[in-house]
Swiss-Prot record:
<dbReference type="GO" id="GO:0043382">
    <property type="term" value="P:positive regulation of memory T cell differentiation"/>
</dbReference>
<dbReference type="GO" id="GO:0046890">
    <property type="term" value="P:regulation of lipid biosynthetic process"/>
</dbReference>
<keyword id="KW-0342">GTP-binding</keyword>
<dbReference type="GO" id="GO:0004613">
    <property type="term" value="F:phosphoenolpyruvate carboxykinase (GTP) activity"/>
</dbReference>
<dbReference type="GO" id="GO:0006107">
    <property type="term" value="P:oxaloacetate metabolic process"/>
</dbReference>
<dbReference type="InterPro" id="IPR008209">
    <property type="entry name" value="PEP_carboxykinase_GTP"/>
</dbReference>
<dbReference type="InterPro" id="IPR013035">
    <property type="entry name" value="PEP_carboxykinase_C"/>
</dbReference>
<dbReference type="GO" id="GO:0000287">
    <property type="term" value="F:magnesium ion binding"/>
</dbReference>
<dbReference type="GO" id="GO:0006094">
    <property type="term" value="P:gluconeogenesis"/>
</dbReference>
<dbReference type="Pfam" id="PF00821">
    <property type="entry name" value="PEPCK_GTP"/>
</dbReference>
<dbReference type="GO" id="GO:0009617">
    <property type="term" value="P:response to bacterium"/>
</dbReference>
<feature type="modified residue" description="Phosphoserine">
    <location>
        <position position="286"/>
    </location>
</feature>
<feature type="modified residue" description="N6-acetyllysine">
    <location>
        <position position="70"/>
    </location>
</feature>
<dbReference type="InterPro" id="IPR008210">
    <property type="entry name" value="PEP_carboxykinase_N"/>
</dbReference>
<dbReference type="GO" id="GO:0018105">
    <property type="term" value="P:peptidyl-serine phosphorylation"/>
</dbReference>
<dbReference type="InterPro" id="IPR035077">
    <property type="entry name" value="PEP_carboxykinase_GTP_C"/>
</dbReference>
<feature type="modified residue" description="N6-acetyllysine">
    <location>
        <position position="521"/>
    </location>
</feature>
Amino acid sequence: MPPQLSNGLNHSAKVVRGTLDSLPQAVRDFVESSAKLCQPDQIHICDGSEEENQQLLSHMEEEGVIKRLKKYDNCWLALTDPRDVARIESKTVIITQEQRDAVPIPRSGLSQLGRWMSPEDFEKAFNARFPGCMKGRTMYVIPFSMGPLGSPLSKIGIELTDSPYVVASMRIMTRMGSAVLDALGAGEFIKGLHSVGCPLPLKKPLVNNWACNPELTLIAHLPDRREIISFGSGYGGNSLLGKKCFALRMASRLAKEEGWLAEHMLILGVTNPEGQKKYFAAAFPSACGKTNLAMMNPTLPGWKVECVGDDIAWMKFDQQGNLRAINPENGFFGVAPGTSVKTNPNAIKTIQSNTIFTNVAETSDGGVYWEGIDQPLAPGIKLTSWKGTEWDPKDGEPCAHPNSRFCTPASQCPIIDPAWEAPEGVPIEGIIFGGRRPAGVPLVYEALSWQHGVFVGAAMRSEATAAAEHKGKVIMHDPFAMRPFFGYNFGKYLAHWLSMAQHPAAKLPKIFHVNWFRKDKDGRFLWPGFGENCRVLAWMFDRVQGKGGARLTPIGYVPEEAALDLRGLEAIRVSELFQVSKEFWEEEADEIHKYLEEQVNADLPYEIQSEVLALKQRISQM
């Protein structure tokens, strides 16, 4: 007779590691009801130990899911099914009773600010996917903490998954294991249920031994029930539920209810030559150099940059009115292509050990390779592409997928900030918005006020390469770099940001906007970027201290020429870098106005509407 789970359900899942008795009652109920539904063969309660990790990695190696990279210490390569390589916005939904709780209702067409699904439609979708979806597989129970264990800003989640790749990655990206269950006790937690959607025996063979079910992929967030439910994809952004699903979509909704902010932002510490230190948070859309800025090697003598986090910030005002931030993650899930000793030497040092690479190319001597790695291959070394075939540059295809990743422990970063795990967080004195803007937008400007700064975040736009090559490059709206990650109505999100100014004793950070990517008429970058960006950080540092010369323009304060330290740089065309053209900004303001009126519509806060009109007025007087 099969063993019975203690709730009397006749279910044959065998607990192969840990015991159900050791789980807090609410966690046990979640595990048992999910096991009854998904019908795994085995249940494995993760303890997070090194021994467990090595066992899982060896098991995946035997199954052909990952390959050991012999050139490095404890590094692994996973190649996915080519249909499962990225987040899928069209299949990522928020479920609420009322559509308007999840997304603003646009004037016409579809909302670009998130996707809503009704509870009724979700129930049908859920019932068509999850019953029996883990047959023949092991259900892993992953207790994890977003943020340092015991920090008042941290939150706990329990993810159930049938993917050992998810377990190994979550051990890097979060604090995971028995200590989390001890800290949880009878406390609240976010529930995550994930399945690759490939019960055994398989109906059709896997590609690259990578389990996924692209036809039925769905990533659903139920904020009222504190649940995340993901089916059909093994890719990180869809399966590591602590990342975007919890840390941004779910957390932004919790933050709204509890009076804090969950943001798509890096956190860095900047120390000047006098030894004074200030922390900044920065929001850039993807492919704008967040990780590179977070791990920068400054070129200015005497300045130091240290990294608290490269992707997500949870921020809350303390009793003294300081905006305190933690990085809720424990690792970096970085885009590999473009990462090199030149662009990001600290990332290259971080990923030499204990790292899981996904969809990069492999060298014949057991190393990794990608576009922009800037290291010539040694004679006789061949490349295997991310598709698992020998790579030839004549094929005209990249050797690594453009969204290929490294998943690596933050503690290995040579410039990790000494306070990166401080339970109280670090005090944020400046917030930076930015995007990739080839024309019209200055290198840096400072917002006129908190309210104007919130408008600057709402107006963020960035160049994205259109999927269809013939379209060329388009400038996309990406407010707060959160467009794919809002957990609730963006109009209400703006009101929440504006409300921070009402916080008693709030020391509101200064808000800045940067653009490293302005080009001249011949298409050449006007600014060298990378380590030279410390010169812009130095000006912001001075501004936060009440120093640093600035002149007023219709869009905000830009540095006076003498205030930006350009020593040692070749012929920088300062006037071109900081030019604010009436013609460009008339068009820009019209486009922003149109977007906010159409997309946010009735939920646009009055204060943001008045900022648009004030900007138009200032431009008209140029």
